[in-house]
Amino acid sequence: MEVNIVNIANEVVGSIDLNPQVFGLEPRRDVLKEVVNWQLAKRRAGTHKAKGISDISGTTAKPYRQKHTGRARQGSLRSPQFRGGAVIFGPVPRSHEYSLNKKVRRLGLKVALSMKVAANKLVVLDSLDVDLKKTADAKGVFGNFAGHSSYLVVSESCKEEVVRACRNLRGVDLLKCVGINVLDILKHDCVILTVDTVKSLEGRLSNE
């Protein structure tokens, strides 16, 4: 599976053979759903909290005697049937994280990359070692890759000045290769990988 290598001006400077074990898989939406749900669950803060009957301030005295009032018996004014009362079985702070098999996570990553290749929305860049000192310069660079609504740039390493130049651009995100994930790939219209990133991903994922 051969694709062109382009430079920062979107000019073809060579070609590279992509490993079909990583970039040539059939779409598996079931796997993508599993991985995305797993990522979203890990992102949840889990800080939701409702006050139980032991958390609410107020008297603990019995509001009135048990019998001979003609009213329903009550033991506390903090019970859930009263205004300002407790919430029964309400949410408590907890982690929503759960485990997902590594094989499924890696398969999801390969399927997401393969879908971008099949849709012709994956660009292989020769290098990101360029001089970009201003946001205007970075905007001009991404103008060379027009036709996409958003861009995810993945590189083994990136200059700090390039990160600063790109971080204020809407629809452009930079990631290190170690942080590439299914959710970010699917959220962005175009994925730009450097040659080093492609080789690194193939080394990590081709033996699965």
Swiss-Prot record:
Keywords: Ribonucleoprotein, Ribosomal protein, RNA-binding, rRNA-binding
Domain of life where this protein originates: Bacteria
Cellular component, GO annotation: ribonucleoprotein complex; ribosome
SUPFAM superfamilies: Ribosomal protein L4
Gene3D superfamilies attached to this UniProt entry: 3.40.1370.10
BP term (GO), one: translation
Sequence segments annotated as region (Disordered): 49-78
Family matches, as Pfam families: Ribosomal_L4
InterPro entries (UniProt xref): Ribosomal_uL4 (IPR002136), Ribosomal_uL4-like (IPR013005), Ribosomal_uL4_dom_sf (IPR023574)
Single GO MF descriptor: rRNA binding
Transmembrane stretches, start-end: none
Function: One of the primary rRNA binding proteins, this protein initially binds near the 5'-end of the 23S rRNA. It is important during the early stages of 50S assembly. It makes multiple contacts with different domains of the 23S rRNA in the assembled 50S subunit and ribosome.
Subunit description: Part of the 50S ribosomal subunit.
Family the entry assigns: Belongs to the universal ribosomal protein uL4 family.
NCBIfam families assigned to the protein according to its UniProt record, in alphabetical order: rplD_bact (TIGR03953)
HAMAP family named in the record: Ribosomal_uL4_B
Name listed for the protein in its UniProt record: Large ribosomal subunit protein uL4
Organism per entry: Anaplasma phagocytophilum (strain HZ)
Lineage: Bacteria, Pseudomonadati, Pseudomonadota, Alphaproteobacteria, Rickettsiales
Gene: rplD
